[in-house]
Amino acid sequence: MATIKCPYCSSKIKLERFQYKDIVDSELNDKYVEEKQNPQNYYSGNDTTNIYVDEEMCKKLDQDAVEFGFVRNKNGNAHSPNRNAFISAIMTNYYDEFNVEEEQKKNVIVDTLKQNIPLLKDVSTNRIASCIMAGMDTLASEKIRNKKIIIKLKKTNMNEDIYDDIQYNKFFNNSISSISEFYYSMFQSFFKLPQYLREQIIFKKKFKDLRKYIEEGKTIHMKYKKDKNYRNVFPYKIVQSVEESHNYLLCVEKTEDRNNPGNIITMCISYRIDNIGDTIKLSNSPFEITEIQKQALDESISNSPSSAQQEPGEHILVALTSTGVGLLDAIYTFKPTHIEPIKQIREYTIYKVYGSKFQSYTYFKRFGEHAIILNDNSFKQSQLISAQKIINNYNSISSQLEEELNQ
């Protein structure tokens, strides 16, 4: 026997256990069964969806779009983010993974509901679980409504399968409470990942193809950046650069020697993977990587994956003034990882810098007169030629330009 209060007259009513169970069962379940059968909101068939985001999320989307090359020329700005293309890439490459994560969360909620409210039917349990998950982002949703930044997502050939699945299946079947909030939750989950993992998601097919050829030990043809020509490359390893948060393909390329035209050489190279073209195919001119090249590339992983060494133990010696020593803490971009002081000669501190010589040259050029690279006659000559050109520019050409400018 159970005693309950009448919701209309507030009088107490005694009920048998089976009667009480039927009332509670009806109260718990009828609402959700009705919502399941008669959804109030439905997909209208529109090929454009409004996604409400806050300023921070909008900024993250735009930054990653530009970083990963999803740009278009708009009003003379060649680096304007192409949001629709970038969001489509997230949808295509992250949708399934995100759904698995969401399903795992929902299953935990469903199990908890079943354990604590056994009278709930499956349809009610699933509906309540969906409502709870939607409520997890309530504060974020309010923040979005207050900001009122709208991203218009257009249905395209690239995203249409995922677009329709979200609109027709998820929303119409009440598995999500709001299309906009679903996209926002997917974006939130995506941006919780470090940049190098986001890059692997956006370029999923490219990474899959590269890993396949690396595992098989096959030479490939690929394009890089805006170069229309294919490069003949033996892919060795995919690595991450901690300071830049990018992924790099360490490889050996068979190419013409720039210093000796007509002479074909192989050289160690590091390519940023997001700049590699989408088309990667088996080479019709295969070659093998040497053990020395493997060792050089392995050392590059710890020294600096963004710039490949040409030989094991590669390093330079550089003399820095006191100002130059201070610049080591001020200039970060392209900075070598391992820089070791070995000797003091008068006002100069001598450093041994491990890793790619090309990277070291590029880095220490910015130190001007406060850095002198030692024991490298070729670099010395190139610097002297460059310095002489600068002297000539200021001794003669600058005066000529100033005269013509003032005419």
PLM regions and their residue ranges:
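Surface-exposed, Lys/Arg-rich phosphate-binding patches that contact polyanionic backbones
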Residues: 55-82, 157-181
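Short cysteine/histidine-rich metal-coordination sites, predominantly Zn2+-binding motifs
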Residues: 21-28
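Core beta-strand-centered patch of the WYL/Sm-like small regulatory domain
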Residues: 192-316
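Short, basic amphipathic alpha-helical segments that act as recognition/interaction helices
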Residues: 31-34, 77-107, 174-200
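Short Lys/Arg-rich basic patches
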Residues: 1-6, 10, 33-66, 108-162
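Short Cys/His-rich "knuckle" micro-motifs
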Residues: 14-19
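Polybasic (Lys/Arg-rich)
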Residues: 302-407
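Bulky hydrophobic/aromatic content
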Residues: 117-146, 150, 159-222
